[in-house]
Amino acid sequence: MNETATSCQFCAISQSLANGKTIARKRPAQLAEVAKAAVELDNVKHMVMTTGTPQTSDRGAAVLCESATAVTTAVDLPIQAQCEPPDDDAWFQRLRDSGVVSLGMHLEAVTDAVRQRIMPGKAQVPLERYFSAFNAAVQVFGRGQVSTYILAGLGDSEDAIAQMSERLASVGVYPFVVPFVPIDGTPLARHPKPDNGFMQRLYPRIGASLRKHGLHSDNINAGCAKCGACSALKHHE
């Protein structure tokens, strides 16, 4: 959702578009061309495709299917797709059939108060819908192949994040917890990062949940949690 009243307060897509650093939509053929070159020239091992949160009932799943089909036709490259819960769980199998091997559906925040304040558009999708979608997606992609971003430092407490991470891990969803980093030009540009102590206390608690439920980032086929560059969670698995 790209309207100011409903957009995620941390999102910089509009700034990137305004500054000419990206285009509104990368066509499937463009993605396939770049993916093939990335594998051949830079030995890239996996790819992430995301749509933001388009105002369509499929929440971007249709364009992800089209794009993944183009890429996997051109090159053998594991793909993680990222979207919000679509209107129909049948989209998960369609994504899998198009070549997507891992899926991200991102909570960002874990309590309703923070969700309403930080991302009013995404907050219109209730947490219980996320969990019904998580359960359906895990049936298609497998345990540990579905993940969700959680941004620590937006206002959720340590306990709230740890408890949500345990709930997610218990159903086979990898809770990829990362410290919030403000981006210039966004409404949260002046919002503080979480302090080191907060993250140092939080990571071991999440790591315990990952071990308890047999989830490990190295086993993820593709995506952000597999890379892990923006979080220290890998060191606590």
Predicted segment positions?
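Short loop/turn motifs at secondary-structure junctions
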Residues: 7, 43-45, 99, 142, ...
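A short glycine-/small-residue-rich loop at the edge of a beta-strand within enzyme catalytic domains
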Residues: 121-128, 152-159, 194-197
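Auxiliary Fe-S-binding modules of radical SAM enzymes
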Residues: 136, 140, 159-237
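Local cysteine-cluster metal-coordination motifs and their immediate loop/turn environment
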Residues: 1-16, 223-235
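Core AdoMet radical
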Residues: 12-31, 38-91, 95-133, 147, ...
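Short, internal active-site loops enriched in acidic
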Residues: 52-57, 85-88, 153-157, 226-231
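Conserved strand-turn element in the central/C-terminal portion of the radical SAM core barrel
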Residues: 80-86, 134-159, 178-182
